[in-house]
Amino acid sequence: MAPSLAVRAASRVESLTRHVVADASGSSLALNPTASNGGVASARPTPGGGPGSLSVVDNRTGKKYELPIEPGGYVPSAALKQITAGGDGAGLRLFDPGYVNTAPCKSKISFIDGDAGVLRYRGYPIETLAETSTYLESAFALVYGDLPSAAQLAEWEQTIMRHSALPVPVIAAIEALPHDAHPMGIILAGLNALSTFHPEQNPALQGGDIYKTHSVQDKQIVRIIGKMTTLAAHAYHRNTGRAPAPPNQKLGYAENFLYMLDAGLDPDHRPNPRLAKALDVMFLLHAEHEMNCSTAAARHLASSGVDVYSAVAGAVGALYGPLHGGANEAVLKMLARIERVENIPAFLDGVKNKKEKMFGFGHRVYKNFDPRAKVIRAVAEEVFSLVGRDPLIDVAVELEKRARADPYFVSRKLYPNVDFYSGLVYRALGFPPEFFTVLFAIPRATGYLAHWREALTDPDQRIMRPQQIYEGPWLREYAPIEGRRDATSDQMWQVEPSNASRRRLAGVVSTHRAGTGDHAAFGRGDVAPLSSATREVEGSDPNRRAFGRGLGPAFSGGVVAGDATSGVDQLMRRR
């Protein structure tokens, strides 16, 4: 894959030039293509065996019911409501923790066959797109259903880049956050701040029908995709104490992102095109993955009619969770702990004996090799050829090889997933672990937007309101407080006293009372915020490429697997 990456990167400027020429000739962007750009390779097998019916006998009553099986291979859950057996008269419901076998919507955006290890965007295999397409081209297909023509792609790319700048008040809101704020928290704050702009396009202010206009939908889509990298650049540099370079609308999407990170005051700086292409492929691979936790959150929020910025922010908040977006950092820590290839057998024995955890293997959906992991391994080799080989890649490759040959892992269908190699790529590109989830959120915003747009025209769409299985007390009388005893549950009142509370209880008189709550005088527990002068000094230190505390080894002076690369070295690597 490495040679083709270099070739495609070298031809990118020429390709964009052709698109610009086509756009200058007066062509327009048709955002609802009707002709399919790519034939159907084969017919889809009948989902779930096809339509029919399911005969159910309720052994409680002896009654027999016929439940319809729809052409998509599913049973409408509402059909169960007819099954009753006295009691409270309620119909039968499904108990499905985690929505393991529940489909809340129908979608045409992406397809996964977990047993075969298949992922397709709008029918296009992910491997083909990674080899031949770009992130923004694939984003167009995800949002609008088909690959764009040359003229459409040119206008799509240019429109997104024209909307890459942030409003000044949004930048001010970011700069008001703590200097060591987590970058995902900054992304969330930025998206929520953006939701307050353009009130004329907010359904809560203008009525629920405002998004039924395609032009209004499309404007929000290009705005969010365009601004995600700029938000990320500000999140990155909020922690370094420097300002990102302004967006360069003449560059490609991933290229402009690296430019904002590294150009500083040099408007002529250009990122390495091969590194930019590698990052573009990573964006493409992470753009969409059907009904995952954060995408489901986006559709859930959108069902309420909330503005799209709030819906995307809620989805990004779900991605912030360590069980969803933070697994690649855990993989890095695992590989660093193994350290050398000769330690792998002992580590695998520890996994089998439940003494070790193996991250980056297995998936909620895939019971085969995650197709994205294969591509990312090739991208890793391309990046290492430019910036130097990370010794942990040898550990990763050998760990994969031995796990795939071990009956213990094969029988449990534990194969490498997308997180196994992605952290190594991001570390080689000079990003600290705290930023990995941001690099996930940037492209996944496209998937959220595709689902948001699809939900707007879904005839089955209604506000999502799952049911619950109630198991609490049935009916209780209210007791006056004078006659109550102390609650005995071990789950009550677990708040630890703050330092300020301890001082007050010790009899120390605090002069910082009004409006402080239980926090110390500094307002953030027992840690004093840095003065503005201190922040400037820390931010200007060239060896601090990223985040003040809890840095990855390459950014804090620590060593992992022999890598003591400083932050400034990472900057020079990307250049």
Indicate where each model-derived feature is located.
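Short, low-complexity, intrinsically disordered N-terminal modules
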Residues: 531-533, 565
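Low-complexity, intrinsically disordered Ser/Thr/Pro- and acidic-rich segments
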Residues: 538, 547-553, 557-558
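Non-transmembrane, aqueous-exposed alpha-helical and coiled segments at domain scale
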Residues: 2-21, 27-522, 555, 567-575
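Short glycine-rich, low-complexity segments
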Residues: 525-528, 539, 561
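Hydrophobic alpha-helical membrane-insertion segments
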Residues: 535-542
